């Protein structure tokens, strides 16, 4: 396509255009990883696709509590190179290695460096827009919204907070100015692994952040129900929780595949509430915190 249908005779400009498209697709893919809390686990260059597709995810997992330093890969436990928070940087690093590999086909560094900037530009733009949609903000407002996003991501790890359930709960936060603080924060309480820790400084910081957030939502003037629908369309209710996957594997090992099939069917519509399947959206139970297969995996798991 880049070469107008030609099957041969590609020149340096064609290879640069090809590389630019790969950088763009890689950035777009990783934005979606960050949106749903997916951790690939082993982002070696040979585990990346030039099509911007998620492949070769062996020791992968989803964030349970929001922890940018988490990786499910036991072999990466010490250095955490491929941790959730590092995935955007690793994506750029991997694209850089591809640029080094195709340099002999291009013969100049500058065009490849310029094409590599596509990754940074696309990721930054799409990530910021993505976070806006997760918060239900239709039109982002420069530095002010960047600070709102930054402060939330700094706040979430202060106590164990289920990422998936927090953003679903945030959709139910009301902009009604007649609510007291307890009623306002109530939709978020189910996301905390130990609600008793939601006190003191963390509670005060959360209340202060909600003040700013609700004020921002009121500026846009959207009806709460419309905003909630938009947020729930980008914030999944169901993800492949590590402990649920292990339970399904355990049952399949006994010859009963029914849980795997039900889980698979549930995940086909991850943004939709599904009566009778609420257990697939529950926080990680305490027993799964350190159980192999639920908290950590190896490449041979």
Located regions from the model:
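Catalytic-loop Lys-Pro-X-Asn motif of eukaryotic-like protein kinases
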Residues: 45-46, 50
């Amino acid at each position: 396509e880049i070469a107008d249908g030609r099957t041969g005779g590609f020149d340096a400009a064609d290879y640069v255009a090809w590389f630019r498209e790969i950088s763009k697709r890689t950035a777009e893919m990783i934005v979606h990883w960050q949106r749903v809390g997916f951790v690939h686990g082993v982002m070696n260059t040979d585990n990346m696709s030039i099509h911007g597709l998620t492949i070769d995810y062996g020791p992968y997992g989803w964030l349970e509590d929001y922890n940018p330093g988490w990786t499910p890969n036991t072999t990466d436990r010490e250095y955490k190179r491929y941790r959730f928070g590092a995935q955007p940087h690793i994506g750029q690093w991997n694209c850089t290695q591809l640029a080094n590999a195709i340099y002999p086909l291009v013969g100049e560094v500058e065009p490849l460096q310029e094409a590599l900037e596509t990754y940074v530009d696309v990721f930054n733009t799409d990530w910021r827009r993505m976070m806006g949609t997760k918060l239900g903000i239709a039109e982002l407002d420069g530095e002010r919204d960047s600070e709102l996003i930054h402060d939330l991501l700094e706040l979430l790890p202060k106590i164990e907070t289920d990422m998936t359930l927090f953003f679903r709960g945030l959709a139910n936060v009301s902009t009604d100015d007649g609510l007291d603080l307890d009623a306002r924060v109530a939709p978020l309480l189910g996301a905390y692994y130990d609600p008793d820790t939601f006190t003191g400084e963390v509670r005060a910081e959360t209340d202060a952040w909600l003040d700013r957030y609700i004020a921002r939502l009121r500026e846009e003037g959207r009806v709460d129900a419309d905003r909630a629908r938009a947020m729930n369309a980008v914030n999944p209710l169901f993800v492949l929780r590590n402990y649920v996957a292990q339970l399904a594997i355990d049952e399949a090992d006994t010859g009963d595949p029914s849980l795997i099939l039900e889980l698979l069917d549930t995940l086909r519509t991850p943004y939709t509430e599904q009566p009778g399947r609420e257990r697939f959206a529950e926080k990680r139970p305490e027993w799964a915190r350190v159980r192999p297969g639920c908290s950590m995996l190896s490449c041979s798991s």
